[in-house]
Amino acid sequence: MSNRGMLIVLSGPSGVGKGTVRQAMLEDEFRDFHYSVSMTTRKPRPGEQDGVDYYFVSKEEFEQEIANDGMLEYAQYVDNYYGTPMKYVNQTLESGRDVLLEIEVQGAMQVREKCPDGVFIFLTPPDLLELRNRIQKRGTDDQATIDKRMQKAADEIRMMENYDYAVVNDEIPNAVQRIEKIIESEHLRVPRVIDQYKKMIGE
């Protein structure tokens, strides 16, 4: 019954399957999700579209957004900024659609400060051995890099206490179903619907 959409933040260690779970959620017909497109100062790659893959802006424009407190979260990688613009998220939420952010733990903590009423879900592997296996199967990292990723994963798992829910990604369909149940329940929380019922009784 809530008119305003809900902000859903999904994060977890590298290799846990955040992107795969996010894509499965968007393909499902459970709810009308909107995946928040990030903003970046890097140049578009062949085939990328502005407003679809990223919002491509200049460094000056991005830094102006930061100065105006217009970013939900941001970080700088290899001389380029990446982040989540607040205005697009707010516009979508006001339209009544849920917004899904798939971001790293550091970014999620920035979002938590600005949007404490969001739903923060931490995606976990069944165990660290399985996480290591998934990273190794990618075939993109050497052993030293994998070890660093595993150490970072342990640090990120320690941050789980800052989230509302922990969901094990053992199988993609199972993880998606668990997240959908969380979202369904969150939409029924009294603080999200109380205004609707007050209007019903004329208050």
From Swiss-Prot:
EC number of this enzyme: 2.7.4.8
UniProt entry tagged with the keyword Kinase: yes
Primary localisation category: cytoplasm
Domain Guanylate kinase-like: 5-184
Highest taxon, organism lineage: Bacteria
InterPro entries tied to this protein: GK/Ca_channel_bsu, Guanylate_kin-like_dom, Guanylate_kinase, Guanylate_kinase_CS, P-loop_NTPase
Protein name, entry field: Guanylate kinase
Gene (name only): gmk
